[in-house]
Swiss-Prot record:
Pfam families: Serpin (PF00079). Essential component of the renin-angiotensin system (RAS), a potent regulator of blood pressure, body fluid and electrolyte homeostasis. Belongs to the serpin family. Disulfide bonds join C42-C161. It comes from Rattus norvegicus. It is found in: Secreted. This is Angiotensinogen. GO terms for molecular function: growth factor activity; hormone activity; receptor ligand activity; serine-type endopeptidase inhibitor activity; type 1 angiotensin receptor binding; type 2 angiotensin receptor binding. PANTHER family: ANGIOTENSINOGEN, SERINE PROTEASE INHIBITOR, SERPIN.
Length: 477
């Protein structure tokens, strides 16, 4: 066996071990045939009918070049348009991709929580994480491509093209997943949800990116910004320039790290996500209200409150309750609150697992007065750190084969995922239903004034778009 072959098998074994450990006893077998290369495509790839020409390349413009800001409404309209054209098979692909992204998200959320430590909060977008990894898959060659596919949780057979993920199909399905989130059936009474994704490809001068690779990321997001800057002379200054650029282009107030990076890096692949939802029938309470970070410490924060008919249930055995708040026709905010705040770590480990959706029940709605902090959550993490924590630091390290990304193999530095999640009062709207009818049960008061978990779930695809933990509404994570 060649050294390269031995290294590939060893790395894949390491990845499989990590996947199996995080999955517990679960056997992760699903039909992925809709996401694989077809036999006809494999035949074309293995026996091209025409001579393959060199792929066109380009050098990104300098980061200080004038750039038009992102139009979030246009991004949303493109997602809506793509979703309106979905056929039955497209929806099946979207459901498969959502399932894989959910599973990947739980694994990485566990790593993120462990890295953050106790009582520091966390937020993660499984689709954004998944899209980032699939983007690298599209830009990679073996052995890196096979390793990334295994990391995504999809089996690969050595030498079998038809067991390979078709990255273009996968990102198109991910586009459908995002579109189903923001498309709410055109209901005029429902405030539209907003989700925007921006990708920054920040390169060292001299690295030329391959045009087909950059274009292939279009379904993930049309808002792609390749920009060049000096990454080696002053890494801290480079990080500041990137942050200023992102702020200027998006207008989003995000938690962007200012740490310097490795001076020999030639590519940063950064993904930025903004989600904004209006809570129909909720209004902001006057003044500030106490949120208990722990038994002895409170902070004063703005609170939202609304009364309506919501689904709510308690798990008496595990001592937590769940309140289900609609954000759209198929989108739900799940608020998970332990009966005792000190149990949050235990509940987090118990609930945020691969079988999370089995915890979601469907009880009859009941009259509830719900009060919770106004959420404006900012979070960032470097995927490289999570891979290193999982002992997979070489996956996107110096030896990674990313030959489809640029004219020379890029050396990947930062792989940032940054999230801005906003849940606001929908004061201009009426409550979902009247709070209480004659003869109905008394209104239940549910107040989230201590640490809790949350998730945003879209029913049609089965996607969990966000997983998070709020320890202190004033903190970024």
């Amino acid at each position: 066996m060649t050294p390269t072959g031995a290294g590939l098998k060893a790395t894949i074994f390491c990845i499989l071990t990590w996947v199996s450990l995080t999955a517990g006893d679960r056997v992760y077998i699903h039909p992925f045939h809709l996401l694989y290369y077809s036999k006809s495509t494999c035949a074309q790839l293995e026996n091209p009918s025409v001579e393959t020409l060199p792929e066109p390349t380009f050098e990104p413009v300098p980061i200080q070049a004038k750039t038009s800001p992102v139009d979030e409404k246009t991004l949303r309209d493109k997602l809506v348009l793509a979703t309106e054209k979905l056929e039955a098979e497209d929806r099946q692909r979207a459901a498969q991709v959502a399932m894989i992204a959910n599973f990947m998200g739980f694994r990485m959320y566990k790593m993120l929580s462990e890295a953050r430590g106790v009582a520091s909060g966390a937020v993660l977008s499984p689709p954004a994480l998944f899209g980032t990894l699939v983007s690298f898959y599209l830009g990679s060659l073996d052995p890196t491509a096979s390793q990334l596919q295994v990391l995504l949780g999809v089996p690969v057979k050595e030498g079998d093209c038809t067991s390979r993920l078709d990255g273009h199909k996968v990102l198109t399905a991910l586009q459908a997943v995002q579109g189903l989130l923001v498309t709410q059936g055109g209901s005029s009474s429902q405030t539209p949800l907003l989700q925007s994704t921006v990708v920054g490809l920040f390169t060292a001068p001299g690295l030329r990116l391959k045009q087909p690779f950059v274009e292939s990321l279009g379904p993930f997001t049309p808002a792609i910004f390749p920009r060049s800057l000096d990454l080696s002379t002053d890494p801290v200054l480079a990080a500041q320039k990137i942050n200023r650029f992102v702020q200027a282009v998006t207008g989003w107030k995000m938690n962007l790290p200012l740490e310097g990076v490795s001076t020999d890096s030639t590519l940063f692949f950064n993904t930025y996500v903004h989600f904004q939802g209006k809570m129909r029938g909720f209004s902001q309470l006057t003044g500030l209200h106490e949120f208990w970070v722990d038994n002895s410490t409170s902070v004063s924060v703005p609170m939202l409150s609304g009364t309506g008919n919501f689904q709510h249930w308690s798990d008496a055995q595990n001592n937590f309750s769940v309140t289900r708040v609609p954000l759209g026709e198929s989108v739900t905010l799940l608020l998970i609150q332990p009966q005792c705040a000190s149990d949050l770590d235990r509940v987090e480990v118990l609930v945020f697992q691969h079988d999370f959706l089995t915890w979601i029940k469907n009880p009859p709605p009941r009259a509830i007065r719900l009060t919770l902090p106004q959420l404006e959550i900012r979070g960032s993490y470097n995927l490289q750190d999570l891979l290193a924590q999982a002992k997979l630091s070489t996956l996107l390290g110096a030896e990674a084969n990313l030959g489809k990304m640029g004219d020379t193999n890029p050396r990947v530095g930062e792989v940032l995922n940054s999230i801005l999640l906003e849940l606001q009062a929908g004061e201009e709207e009426q409550p979902t239903e009247s709070a209480q009818q004659p003869g109905s049960p008394e209104v239940l008061d549910v107040t989230l004034s201590s640490p809790f978990l949350f998730a945003i779930y879209e029913r049609d695809s089965g996607a969990l778009h966000f997983l998070g933990r709020v320890d202190n509404p004033q903190n970024v994570v």
